[in-house]
């Protein structure tokens, strides 16, 4: 089984690309969705114990938790120590299920793949990319953040040019879905020929 790491900066089209991998029959592990699931249940008691008042009705109140840890590196580290082992267990279950289903390829959808050293745990890296203009246009069209917040997020992420340089495959999402589907088909044909690389 080959493990593909899928990453890309905000607004590049990573979520759409992940959906198209799933549409092609590839099991996809969504790291963000897995964290949200943990916040909905399993992780809530430990988070409440560490950060009192950040949960309600057995679920993590994400805005409250974010406000509590955002400017406190020690608190962020403490939160990671709670969540990461649970995340690791959910990822292992995903791998076991994929192995049982004889999946030749799986995708790990990890927004901060390079920032967290995740590229060492995969056989090949797929970076989703588009022009900076289209990236801004997409994010600002969502209406969930302004230019200043977008700039702050982009500043924290590995630059797109560096991600592309470190990628085994680059998916360009500038021209609609059909070209992306074609790029995915090419990647799936190529990755099974590649040697296993993960540590």
Curated annotation (Swiss-Prot):
Record's GO cellular component terms: cytoplasm
Molecular function as annotated in GO: ATP binding; dephospho-CoA kinase activity
Disulphide-bridged cysteine pairs: none
Reaction equation(s) it catalyzes: 3'-dephospho-CoA + ATP = ADP + CoA + H(+)
UniProt-annotated binding residues for ATP: 11-16
Keyword Kinase appears in the UniProt entry: yes
Protein's UniProt name: Dephospho-CoA kinase
Species of the source: Bradyrhizobium diazoefficiens (strain JCM 10833 / BCRC 13528 / IAM 13628 / NBRC 14792 / USDA 110)
């Amino acid at each position: 089984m080959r493990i593909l790491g899928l990453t890309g900066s905000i607004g590049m089209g990573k979520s759409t690309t992940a959906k198209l991998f799933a549409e092609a029959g590839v099991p996809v592990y969504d790291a963000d969705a897995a964290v949200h699931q943990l916040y909905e249940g399993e992780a809530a008691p430990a988070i409440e114990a560490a950060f009192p008042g950040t949960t309600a009705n057995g679920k993590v109140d994400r805005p409250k938790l974010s406000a509590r840890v955002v400017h406190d590196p020690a608190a962020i580290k403490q939160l990671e120590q709670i969540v990461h082992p649970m995340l690791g267990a959910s990822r292992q279950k995903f791998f076991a299920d994929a192995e049982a289903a004889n999946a030749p390829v799986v995708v790990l959808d990890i927004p901060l793949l390079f920032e967290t050293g995740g590229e060492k745990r995969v056989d090949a890296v797929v970076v989703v990319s588009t022009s900076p203009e289209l990236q801004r246009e997409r994010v600002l069209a969502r209406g969930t953040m302004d230019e200043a917040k977008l700039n702050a997020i982009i500043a924290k992420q590995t630059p797109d040019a560096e991600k592309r340089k470190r990628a085994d495959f680059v998916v360009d999402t500038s021209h609609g879905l059909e070209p992306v589907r074609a790029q995915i088909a090419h990647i799936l044909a190529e990755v099974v020929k590649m040697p296993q690389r993960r540590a």
